[in-house]
Every structure is written in C-alpha cells, then in structure tokens.
C-alpha cells in the first residue's frame, strides 16, 4: 500500500504531499479532506500515490476520503495536466474551474468544513411489495381496485407499466419517464430511423443514501385488502380516465408479467399520480416507499427518432465517418441554414448506440435554447444540460452522477462542460467553433474550449467535429494543411435559399436626404414592405444602451467612470435614465446640468439598441417591437419570453446585439438590417475583419430560412470595404485568403503563437516600472519576439491601472520550450521584492 499521496488543492499552488494513514485505501483521482497550514481544511484531489518520503520532518495525514467515488480517471488527469501546462497555470487553478463550488468546501476547522460539505438529496422510490409480484395476485388486486378505488387502480397501473421493459409493454403504455415524449415529431425535418435503446429499469441495487429507509406498514398486507377496507371514501362514477385505464389494464395483464421486472423500483418524479393516492397504496401494503440518493438526469429507457437527411447531408455524413477513420478532428464547414444539426444528431445517435459518451459544446446555453430543445425532443432523458447558470447543487449532482456512469451519456453544455467526468468520451461536437465565447478570460486557466476539445478527444481515443458557417482562420488553415479533415455543406436545407445581401451607402443617403434617424430610406422601405406582407424583421446593432456617451455641446464635457478610464454609457429604460459603466458596473444619475459649464442641454451621442428600439417604434407605430440584449434579458425566463414571443409572431421587429445571431431559426424572418457595419470592421484588432465577416454572416443567416426569400441590408459609410464586399458575396474563402496573407506578412496567428501578459496595480508609476522591467527581461531571452510594454485602450479598470507585454512565438519554434523559458522569467519577476505586489496575468492564445 502506498504511504504518501500528492494532493492537488484548489489554490494557485503546486501539489503537496500528505501521508496516507494505515488502513486507509485511496485511489488516484479521488477527493479527500486535508488540513493545509495551521487552520485551513480543504478538499483535495489525490494526484499521485507513492512511497517516496518528502524531505521534511512532519507530514500531515489525509483525514478522510470524500464522496465515495473516483472523481477523475486517468484520461481526465492527463487532460488537466495538459491544460495546466499549456495555459501556464497550476493544477489547483484547473481544479477551481473544473469542479462545482459545492465540491470544494473549505473551513478553519473540520466542523466548519463539514457544515459546508455537499450532501446528496434523497428522493422516494416506489416498488411493489413481494406479495404482489405475481400475475395472479396482480389480477386479483386490479379487480378489487377497479371496483372500489379507481384512483388507486390508475396509480397501480402506472407503476406496473413503468416497471415493465418496453418490449413487454403490450398495452403501449410509455415506460419510465413516459418516454419523455421523445417520439415527438422532429422540428423541421421528417423523422425516420427509430433507434430503440436497450431497455432497463431502475433496480433495487441503485445507489442509496446512507440513511435510506423503508416505510413500514402494520399488519398483514394481504389482510388489509378486504372489500370493506379498499374504498377511497364516498363512491363516485368511474371517470373517463379510469375507463381508459381499465382498457389499458386488460391489455397489460393479458401480456406476460416477468417477476424480475416487477421486482424493480420507480422514482417518484417519474410518476404522474398524486402523492396522497400513492400514500394510500403504501399504507395498505401494496407498494413500498424508500429513500434513495437522488440521481438527477440519469438516462431512462428512451427511443429516439432521427431526422431524414437530404442527399447533400447524407454525403457529408458519409465523408465524416470516413475521415474519422484516419483523423481525430473534422471541420464541417456548412453555410447558415444548411442543416449541420441534423448531421450532429446522426453522429450522436451512433455514438450513444455503442454505449459511449457524447459532449456537444455550444457557445452559450441561453443563446442556443432552440438547439438544446431540439436535442431534448430527439434524445429525451439522455440529454444532460450543464452550464454555469445552473444551481451549484444541480451542477454537483450532475458531476457525481456522471462519476458513477458506465457510459451512454449525452451532455450539452458551455465550455465548462469539458471538465465533466465522461469516462467513455468518444465524440465531441463543437457547434459554432469560431465563437469567442469558447475562450475564458478570467480566472485562470484562460483556456479555449475548442482547442481543449481537440486535445480531450485525442486523449480519450475519440473524435471531435468542429462545425461552423464561418470557421476561425486557425481551424480553416489546419484543415487546409490536412491536420483536420474537411467536409463542406454548401447548400441550405429544404426549400430555403441564401438571402440576397445588399450594401446601402450611408454617406450617399445623407447627401440625398434619404435618411431618417439611423436608417437609410432603402432599409425603411424594405421594413415597410415586410410588415405589409406580415413578415418579420431583425435589426442588428452591436452596441447596447441608448448612447455610448452624453456630451455637453458647449464645452465638450463627457461623463466618465470614477473607477475605469471609460465614458459612461447612457441607458434609458422606460421612464428612468442612468449612466452605467460596462466594465465595473458603476451607475449614476444623468446630471441635470453640465458639471463644467452648467449648460443644461446635455446631448446623447451615437446610438445603441435602446435608441434603435425607440426610433423604429416611432417610425412604425403599428409594429410590435422587442429588444434582445444583455439589458433586456435580466433572467433566463425573460430571454425565453422574448424569443418565444418572436417565434409565435407576437413581435414584428426584433432589435438586438450579437445575441440575435446565435442559433436562432425563425421561419417568419425575411429581412435583416445591419445598422452600422463600420464599427465592426474598424475595431483596433488584427482579428477585426475576420470577426466582422463572421458576425455579419451569422446575422445575415437568420433571414429566409424557409420558403420565404430573405434579404439583408448592410448600412455602411465604406461600401468599398473588402470585408463588407466579401460578406455581400458570401465569399468566405476570399476573406480567408486575404486575411491569412496579411497575417503571414505581419507575423500573427495562425503563423505565430501569442502570449499576452497583463500587469495590474493601483500605483501607475510602479506598474509602468514593472512593465518596462518585465519587457526587458523577456527581450534578453526572446529578442525581437517581445512587443511592449503597451498601454491598452482602457488602461484603468476597477481602480487598477493596466499595462501589457506581448510575446510572439513563430509556429515553427518549440512552443513548449518557449513556455518553459517564459515561466522562468515570470517566476523571477514575481520573486523580486520591488514588483512582487504587481498582479501579473498570463493569457496563452489571447482572443
């Protein structure tokens, strides 16, 4: 038995060695309670077990194991190690991101730790008592209940039907979870290829809580069911439901009732029967109730129907299968509306059929609600949704359930789902792989979920499918070089055709007097035509709020944040007016007078979504207008309400930021207006053109997704802009070739790796001295590969001043060695007395 364990703690520290007490059995990847320092108690992960005694006198012992299950398998530990190494952070920082908060309690004593320790919820499971697990006794019982207690009759019928495996369910009664309506029609595609999954009923061997109990009943159960005691009270005529249930019972009891199935149990949450009726059956000794540890989201018996593929989709699916035989990763480059999701569904079904796990990554769960709902309609209770907006208890229960799973799991999640314990992970699908939401900015590790998905799939011996209509240039070049396979789906699904894209010259409209508010006449006329035909419109302005700032027309004063070096955004929601900082959240009232010169008519400058909403409602007073941005979506319920209202055609015009570009499929939208393309193209970022193309193409793709032709109008003061013309021509490859040529010339990704170093401190002089010292230390090792120090456009946030240093490493050099040298320089910088108080952040592959 190993005597020592290297334990990873949720700290920005290396692993520490603890002693394993005699008689305690531990496994690598298991969670344990340890004391760290004089009075801190933490959850730790056993990383290595060994017999090498450390070179210090007193070694603290592991206090006790936690959770009773291994949290991390070998592949997952290797994945954590890769993340920590590549993104230059500690395993403890990976642990902080990977595990739900309730799995990382801490305290100043064991008692305080125990008070915050996660305790699984229990739930009630029902089973037939042994006396009624035969056909003869069930026939007799149904006959008695049918005469005197129709509600108990229906409850027992539901329990028996739920216990039976589907092939034995001759009555056609849905099995567990009522089949979750998983055989419902599939969205916008014809359903075929019904795939039945192996039936299985919850058994008495399911994990139970330590305090699991059986509810006792008094007396002999067989005696409690005389005709005198079975009634439910005053007699009543049988309801339609009970008559239907009687027919179901006849069919059910006409089929064989295997005793092994009747010996199973069913959780309360899967029964529609009211609790008082179940209690009556329990009290009279027909059923038994026991408390078990809740296993949320566990896959029940399901059968799912797969959408019929078009010939083009079928060819793509075949190509992907063939490429998976020789490559880990494949890029599915499909135009908007081409039906990439249908291909995902077929690959997911094939993987689940083999008993393997699937992970579908989406940029943001809330913004891809339609995709999640589609998957739930197809795969039913197999779908587990995981993201940061779930309660910590729900996230923890899901994590622990997956630790016990033997495979066949399907998780749909945002980037954090990458760290779930899917032991048989064989397929990762990254939808909208280009999306910047896959990159974590804070805290460390500052990882890109797309890149991590490729590594995870390789470590688990699986495959990754990267899907996008506008792939990132890194992914596109990897496919062009043969690192990834590439499959192109170049036509829209069904009758839908690509939208017509029109460039509208804003400067010309102003000169001709053909502009009202922030709309060219060309766009206003198109909106009027769509409204007259009963069609819907989406208007895109990638700036929330009413105006970017307010200004004094007399002296030029603008309101600025006291904590950050930015102007305050003017918001005007309903009757309230306020100035808000979008960096730190500072809010203040709009001044009545200019603080500098006392002029009273302060003027909003520029426009955001709130102003667009107000102006379009004034120009089209009969139109029903809604807004979708971070300010209007105060909760998931508000988001779903806005989206559902637009889908029902309760809204004619939807105004929004980039939130309207992600994953939506509204059949009534025939016009999309992009109100200000210039602020996308002219951003001071080497990726500006690529991102402008991606965003405008994704927004444009919302138009004309059914038989109704779509049109997109792009308002710009620079109609000759290459990227805007490339969007209008839907020419991704022209954009890619041009941008890659420029990046090759100036030595930017994907022809170089970047590491961005950000220094923060409240003393600007100390900060800039430290930034200069760090840049010089890096130049002594990396030479001209170092840029900076630089002052970012926003150089003060939350009271801290910022400075930056950028390291470029050519793609042909060893990035592993570069990180090793960089770590040496950073450690030496942090150890120095003068600059140790400077907060230094390291971002590998910054976005």
What is the role of each PLM region?
Residues 776, 780-801, 822, 840-844:
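A carboxyl-terminal module marker
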Residues 620-623, 778-786, 831-835:
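Short secondary-structure junctions
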Residues 763-764, 808-814:
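Helix N-cap motif at beta-to-alpha junctions
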């Amino acid at each position: 038995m190993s005597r020592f364990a290297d334990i990873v703690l949720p700290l920005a520290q290396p692993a520490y060695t603890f002693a394993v007490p005699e008689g305690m059995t531990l496994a690598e990847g298991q969670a344990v309670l340890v004391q760290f320092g004089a009075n801190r108690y933490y959850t730790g992960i056993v990383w290595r077990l060994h017999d090498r005694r450390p070179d210090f006198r007193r070694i603290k012992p592991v206090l006790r194991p936690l959770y009773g299950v291994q949290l991390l398998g070998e592949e997952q530990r290797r994945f954590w190690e890769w993340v920590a190494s590549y993104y230059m952070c500690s395993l403890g920082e990976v642990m902080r991101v990977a595990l739900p908060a309730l799995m990382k309690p801490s305290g100043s004593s064991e008692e305080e730790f125990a008070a915050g320790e996660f305790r699984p919820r229990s739930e009630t499971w029902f089973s037939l008592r042994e006396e009624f697990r035969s056909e003869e006794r069930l026939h007799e019982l149904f006959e008695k209940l049918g005469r005197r207690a129709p509600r108990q009759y229906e409850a027992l019928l539901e329990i028996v039907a739920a216990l039976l495996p589907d092939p034995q369910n001759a009555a056609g009664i849905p099995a567990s979870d009522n089949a979750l309506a998983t055989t419902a029609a599939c969205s916008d595609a014809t359903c075929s290829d019904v795939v039945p999954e192996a039936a299985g009923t919850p058994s008495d061997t399911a994990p139970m809580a330590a305090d699991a109990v059986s509810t006792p009943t008094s007396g002999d159960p067989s005696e409690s069911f005389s005709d005198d005691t079975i009634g439910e009270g005053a007699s009543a005529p049988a309801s339609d439901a009970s008559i239907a249930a009687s027919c179901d019972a006849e069919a059910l009891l006409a089929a064989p009732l295997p005793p092994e199935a009747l010996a199973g149990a069913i959780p309360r949450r899967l029964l529609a029967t009211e609790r008082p009726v179940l209690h009556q059956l329990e009290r009279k000794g027909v059923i038994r109730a026991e408390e078990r540890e809740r296993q949320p989201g566990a896959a029940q018996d399901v059968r799912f129907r797969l959408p019929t593929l078009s010939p083009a989709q079928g060819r793509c699916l075949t190509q992907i299968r063939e490429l998976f035989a020789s490559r880990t990763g494949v890029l599915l480059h499909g135009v908007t509306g081409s039906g990439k999701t249908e291909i995902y569904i077929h690959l997911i079904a094939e993987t689940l059929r083999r008993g393997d796990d699937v992970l579908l990554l989406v940029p943001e769960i809330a913004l891809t609600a339609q995709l999640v709902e589609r998957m739930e309609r197809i795969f039913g209770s197999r779908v587990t949704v995981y993201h940061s907006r779930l309660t910590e208890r729900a996230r923890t229960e899901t994590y622990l359930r997956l630790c016990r799973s033997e495979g066949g799991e399907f998780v749909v999640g945002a980037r954090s789902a990458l760290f779930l314990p899917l032991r048989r992970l064989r397929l990762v699908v990254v939808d909208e792989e280009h999306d910047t939401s896959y990159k974590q900015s804070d805290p460390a590790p500052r990882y890109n979920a797309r890149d991590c998905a490729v590594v995870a799939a390789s470590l688990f011996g699986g495959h990754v499918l990267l899907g996008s209509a506008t792939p990132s240039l890194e992914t596109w070049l990897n496919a062009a070089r043969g690192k990834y396979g590439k499959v192109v789906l170049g036509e829209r699904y069904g009758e839908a055709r690509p939208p017509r894209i029109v460039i509208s010259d804003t400067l010309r409209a102003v000169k001709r007097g053909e502009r009202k508010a922030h709309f060219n006449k060309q766009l206003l006329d198109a909106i009027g035509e769509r409204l007259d035909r009963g069609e819907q419109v989406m208007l895109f302005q990638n700036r929330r709020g009413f105006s970017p700032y307010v200004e004094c027309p007399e002296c030029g004063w603008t309101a600025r944040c006291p904590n950050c070096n930015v102007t305050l955004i003017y918001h005007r929601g309903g009757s309230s007016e306020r100035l808000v900082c979008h960096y730190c959240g500072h809010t203040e009232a709009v001044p009545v007078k200019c603080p500098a010169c006392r002029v009273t008519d302060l003027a909003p400058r520029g426009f955001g979504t709130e102003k667009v909403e107000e102006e379009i409602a004034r120009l089209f007073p009969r139109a029903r207008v809604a807004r979708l941005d971070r300010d209007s979506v105060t909760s998931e319920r508000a988001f779903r309400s806005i989206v559902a209202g637009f889908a029902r055609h309760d809204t004619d015009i939807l105004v929004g930021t980039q939130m309207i570009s992600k994953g939506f499929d509204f059949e009534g939208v025939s016009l999309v207006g992009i109100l200000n393309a210039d602020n996308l193209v002219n951003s001071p970022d080497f990726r500006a053109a690529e991102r402008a193309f991606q965003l405008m193409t994704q927004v444009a793709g919302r138009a004309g997704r059914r038989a109704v032709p779509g049109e997109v109008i792009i308002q710009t003061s620079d109609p000759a802009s290459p990227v805007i013309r490339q969007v209008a021509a839907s020419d991704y490859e022209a954009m890619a070739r041009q941008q890659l040529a420029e990046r090759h010339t100036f030595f930017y990704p994907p022809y170089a790796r970047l590491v961005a170093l950000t220094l923060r401190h409240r003393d600007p002089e100390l900060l800039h001295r430290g930034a200069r010292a760090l840049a010089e230390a890096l130049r002594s090792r990396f030479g001209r590969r170092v840029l900076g120090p630089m002052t970012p456009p926003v150089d003060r946030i939350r009271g801290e001043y910022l400075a930056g240093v950028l390291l470029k490493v050519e793609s042909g050099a060893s990035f592993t060695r570069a990180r090793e040298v960089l770590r040496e320089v950073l450690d030496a910088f942090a150890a120095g007395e003068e600059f140790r108080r400077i907060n230094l952040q390291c971002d590998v592959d910054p976005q």
